[in-house]
Structures are given as C-alpha cells and as structure tokens.
Amino acid sequence: MRLLAQLLGLLMLWVPGSSGDIVMTQTPLSSPVTLGQPASISFRSSQSLVHSDGNTYLSWLQQRPGQPPRLLIYKVSNRFSGVPDRFSGSGAGTDFTLKISRVEAEDVGVYYCTQATQFP
C-alpha cells in the first residue's frame, strides 16, 4: 500500500497597492505526494527579485503542524543549518522552486516562500 503525505503550499503575496508592488504566486497550493518520492513547489514573482546589491533574498520556510515556521532555504539555494540535504532551492529572476528529493513523513506541513527585495 502506498503511503501518502500531504504537502501544503501557501500563496504568499503582498497585497498590491501600486504598480511597483511585488506579487508572489506559489503553485501548487496543495499537493498529495508519496513517501520516498520527490516533490516540488514553485512560485513566480511579478518582477525580478534581484536586489540592487546583486543578491536575491528569496527564502523558503516550513511550518509543521503545531510548530512555528522554520527557515529551510535562504538566498535562493542555501540550506539553513540542520536542514537535511533532501531539500534544495533553485531559480533566478522571477521563477523559483523548492525540491524535496525523497519525501519523509516529517515533511508534512505548510511551505512558505518569502522575499526581502521589497517591502510593502
């Protein structure tokens, strides 16, 4: 019998108030996955996330049920201390992806993508 885990992606966006605001659209919003198999979540930004200093301040966070969010990936592809190597981040400009090479039961939760290029 195949075991399924539910990974939840969450749409994270700044409510547009002017043409300069960055809108981030994450897909899929919810994704059933099979334990031991790969999974990915992608998002697209309405404009480039490359900061004026040349860095891209894009992070991925994971929130397990009943726990606060924890940082997984920062600056697109850097794993935070203690994050398993099955998690990886990639992308550039406006398109970014979080990949899990082999889903484990402890990976169930809500995943957020955040940017620090522009604030509302």
UniProtKB/Swiss-Prot annotation:
Keyword field: Adaptive immunity, Cell membrane, Immunity, Immunoglobulin, Immunoglobulin domain, Membrane, Secreted, Signal
Entry-linked InterPro entries: Ig-like_dom, Ig-like_dom_sf, Ig-like_fold, Ig_V-set, IgV_Light_Chain
Chain intervals for the UniProt region annotation (Framework-2): 60-74
A Pfam family of this chain: V-set
Listed SUPFAM superfamilies: Immunoglobulin
Region Complementarity-determining-2, annotated ranges: 75-81
Region (Framework-3): 82-113
Chief localization: secreted
Residues covered by region (Complementarity-determining-3): 114-120
Region described as Framework-1: 21-43
GO cellular component: extracellular region; immunoglobulin complex; plasma membrane
Gene Ontology biological-process entries: adaptive immune response; immune response
Keyword field contains Membrane: yes
Region (Complementarity-determining-1): 44-59
Domain Ig-like: 20-120
Location within or outside the cell: Secreted; Cell membrane
Record's signal peptide: 1-19
Protein task: Probable non-functional open reading frame (ORF) of V region of the variable domain of immunoglobulin light chains. Non-functional ORF generally cannot participate in the synthesis of a productive immunoglobulin chain due to altered V-(D)-J or switch recombination and/or splicing site (at mRNA level) and/or conserved amino acid change (protein level). Immunoglobulins, also known as antibodies, are membrane-bound or secreted glycoproteins produced by B lymphocytes.
Assembly, per entry: Most probably, the immunoglobulin is not assembled due to incorrect folding of light chain. Immunoglobulins are composed of two identical heavy chains and two identical light chains; disulfide-linked.
Protein name (database record): Probable non-functional immunoglobulin kappa variable 2D-24
Species name: Homo sapiens (Human)
Encoding gene (name): IGKV2D-24
